[in-house]
Amino acid sequence: MGCYDYVRFENKDYVLPDSLPVAGIVFQTKDLGGNFSTIVIDHDGSLVMDDMWKLFQDIEFYFYTVVDGVLYEYKAFFQGGVLTKIEVVL
């Protein structure tokens, strides 16, 4: 099992929830109106998202995990409001 340190988004105001489940990577977004949205990426790379994420057109974001003491960085790509890929940043 890994622990999840932080998520870095580009040009947005985002916050991590207080606790992260071991089942996957979970983080929340907070818009200017104070509304929250949650996104989950499971260990198998599958994405669970709510309707708010479907509003995004083109966005890239980074997230990090530490597994067995090794730091992994990932970059996720949305195009046209759809997640198109998640890649490991080497």
Where in the sequence are the language-model features?
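Charged, low-complexity surface segments at secondary-structure and domain boundaries
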Residues: 13, 44-46, 90
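Broad, structure-driven detector of short, well-ordered beta-strand segments within folded domains
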Residues: 7, 25-30, 35-45, 72-80
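Surface loops and adjacent helix of pleckstrin homology
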Residues: 19, 52, 88
